[in-house]
Amino acid sequence: MKRTFVLAVSILFVFVSIGAIVSSADKSKTYYVCNCQDDCKCNFVANKPGKCNCGTNLAAMHVLAIEKGLGIFCRCGADCSCERSKSDPGKCGCGKSVKTVGLKGKYVCDCGPGCNCGTISEKPGKCHCGKDLKQVS
């Protein structure tokens, strides 16, 4: 019974954390996103620097838009203040290609109720804190 309660509270926290990441997305917030290739399917997003499950360093990006469960990120870096291009939605105002990341994460950090990692990934692996990512079903 206690284990079920702890699991339920953990899952609730995960959904609240995901909602906080999505709802608090603003253009001044720096996110750390896997940027291994243009066809990268890692969908790894965190609020702290580190490495993706594929081994690539996470790149500092800011969110341009959130659309239909996808985060659209500017690849210009943490200090960028670009807007999304009005003439080409696949680019930011500076002309660089945007990075699209699915935010409906299948794997999240399993630190527990006090978790501040904010790690979301499409693949199993390790969080930046060293804990295993847990599949949300």
Question: Where is each model-derived feature located?
Answer:
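Intrinsically disordered, low-complexity terminal tails/loops enriched in metal-binding residues
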Residues: 20-137
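N-terminal export/membrane-targeting signals
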Residues: 1-25
